[in-house]
Amino acid sequence: MGEQQLDCALDLMRRLPPQHCDKNLTDLIDLCPHLVDDLLSTIDQPLKIAADRETGKQYLLCDYNRDGDSYRSPWSNTYDPPLEDGQLPSEKRRKMEIEANAAFESYRDLYFEGGVSSVYFWDLDNGGFAGIVLIKKEGDGAKNITGCWDSIHVIEITERARQAHYKLTSTIMLWLQTNKSSSGVMNLGGSLTRQHEMDAPINDQNTHLANMGRMIEDQESKMRLTINEIYFGKTKKVMSDLRSTEKQSELEKQDEIVRELNNAMANRGN
């Protein structure tokens, strides 16, 4: 019964607007308090933004930079609120973290023309390591259109001699809302999750960053194409069909004229 309830809850959350995720998740937990741990660990929530007290730069919050009620900034490597014994990445991972944050800032500006990004790394018990790349871009409300893009990429790396195995899990949450006098209010949103694994040669940590960068870039490109062609394309078709029902009689007349012209041309050919 518990597994069935969890599956139904996850299926429901996939169909609800991402911008209301916090409220919907709270309501689900109230309905099924015994599923609280599973729901919190399974459901991706829209990313929240904080500002580094030392540098003033913005960064994104997630479970992987959290220790208790404090969050670690990727810029100063300090916790807010301050935490004396908070978990910190090893020197090797911290160096990679600094380089990755700089690289994905450039990636974010190139593909999203702004927004906020954060990268965090940590060591795994099996000798490998893992990281998470977060990107958030909010719409500016121009032309009465608001919205937000959140992408979450969790990647696990296992080194084998001069080879590395990469396992990537990517989630994109997107919502758009238009409010125009001519068309009224329309909400469009949802989430998409994909996984991908690959093996690649390595020389040093810079090779890791290059491999991860290409992998994430390719994954985001494919997911963006899927969202654009399948989800937005299907919505556009549905809206077009709804609008065309008012002129159904005119369309039928046009079809009849086309058939008559085709028949006339066919008879002339005979």
Curated annotation (Swiss-Prot):
Gene Ontology biological process terms in this record: actin cytoskeleton organization; barbed-end actin filament capping; cell morphogenesis; embryonic axis specification; negative regulation of filopodium assembly; regulation of lamellipodium assembly
Pfam families: F_actin_cap_B
GO molecular function: actin filament binding
Subcellular localization(s) per the UniProt record: Cytoplasm, Cytoskeleton
Membrane-crossing residue ranges in chain numbering: none
PROSITE patterns in alphabetical order: F_ACTIN_CAPPING_BETA
GO CC, one annotated term: dynactin complex
Keywords: Actin capping, Actin-binding, Cytoplasm, Cytoskeleton
Family: Belongs to the F-actin-capping protein beta subunit family.
Subunit organization: Component of the F-actin capping complex, composed of a heterodimer of an alpha and a beta subunit.
Free-text function comment from the UniProt entry: F-actin-capping proteins bind in a Ca(2+)-independent manner to the fast growing ends of actin filaments (barbed end) thereby blocking the exchange of subunits at these ends. Unlike other capping proteins (such as gelsolin and severin), these proteins do not sever actin filaments.
Protein name: F-actin-capping protein subunit beta
